[in-house]
């Protein structure tokens, strides 16, 4: 059975959880979807883990289209979310062009990084049959503006701004949210306050779903792992088992634990 946005909306309504992993090719797309993971994110994180870049900024739309096509060919029924890359949402015209290319490549939804200013684009995309996932908190495409990879919403003003932006985008018709590196209490509050399902990464177990970069949860990314990462490969010794263990841990609430949150 294919997973749709309605599946994830009902999961939230019923108080259940769902899992998301990144994939960039047909082989891993198949393995991840066969493990029961509800959604696959074709992330611009491919810049880091596939291309060896130091950020996601160099990733192009053409590259995102190519990897989305690859993932779509291997997918066995998971919902496919594709990132609109750096500067892809600089104007409404660019956003529409990028969304068209990614949806025609096989995505079921596009993901935009930003804040309340995304509302107009989300409304227009919705009218044209394109569901949107809004990525808030730490937005890696803005790493140069943020001054590094830092937890967002730590002080009262930052928290209020994030919560207000989430409500605005929820009203605009956002289908899903991703909260990255947002304090646990704030992540839980946003999850309660918005109708759309919320996916966490370095956020809170109270979020409706969780996402990790595949290479991180397999323990094969270079460098020191982020606080929110758990190495499921080390626990299982097998990739298929690692994907299943991750899915199980998200759904039974054992991941993320306190040590994975801020």
Swiss-Prot record:
EC number: 2.1.2.11
Annotated binding of Mg(2+), by residue: 44, 83, 113
Cofactor: Mg(2+)
Keywords in alphabetical order: Cytoplasm, Magnesium, Metal-binding, Pantothenate biosynthesis, Transferase
Gene Ontology CC annotations of this record: cytoplasm
Active-site residues, record numbering mapped to chain: 180
Protein residues bound to 3-methyl-2-oxobutanoate: 44-45, 83, 111
Catalytic activity: 3-methyl-2-oxobutanoate + (6R)-5,10-methylene-5,6,7,8-tetrahydrofolate + H2O = 2-dehydropantoate + (6S)-5,6,7,8-tetrahydrofolate
Compartment(s) where it occurs, according to its Swiss-Prot or TrEMBL record: Cytoplasm
Biological process, per Gene Ontology: pantothenate biosynthetic process
Cofactor descriptive note: Binds 1 Mg(2+) ion per subunit.
Enzyme class: transferase
GO MF annotations in UniProt: 3-methyl-2-oxobutanoate hydroxymethyltransferase activity; magnesium ion binding
Chief location: cytoplasm
Pathway linked to the protein: Cofactor biosynthesis; (R)-pantothenate biosynthesis; (R)-pantoate from 3-methyl-2-oxobutanoate: step 1/2
Transmembrane segments: none
Pfam families linked to this entry: Pantoate_transf
Subunit (UniProt): Homodecamer; pentamer of dimers.
HAMAP family per the UniProt record, alphabetical: PanB (MF_00156)
Known role: Catalyzes the reversible reaction in which hydroxymethyl group from 5,10-methylenetetrahydrofolate is transferred onto alpha-ketoisovalerate to form ketopantoate.
PANTHER family, sorted: 3-METHYL-2-OXOBUTANOATE HYDROXYMETHYLTRANSFERASE
Family statement drawn from the similarity comment of this UniProt entry: Belongs to the PanB family.
Protein name: 3-methyl-2-oxobutanoate hydroxymethyltransferase
Organism encoding this protein: Alcanivorax borkumensis (strain ATCC 700651 / DSM 11573 / NCIMB 13689 / SK2)
Lineage summary: Bacteria, Pseudomonadati, Pseudomonadota, Gammaproteobacteria, Oceanospirillales
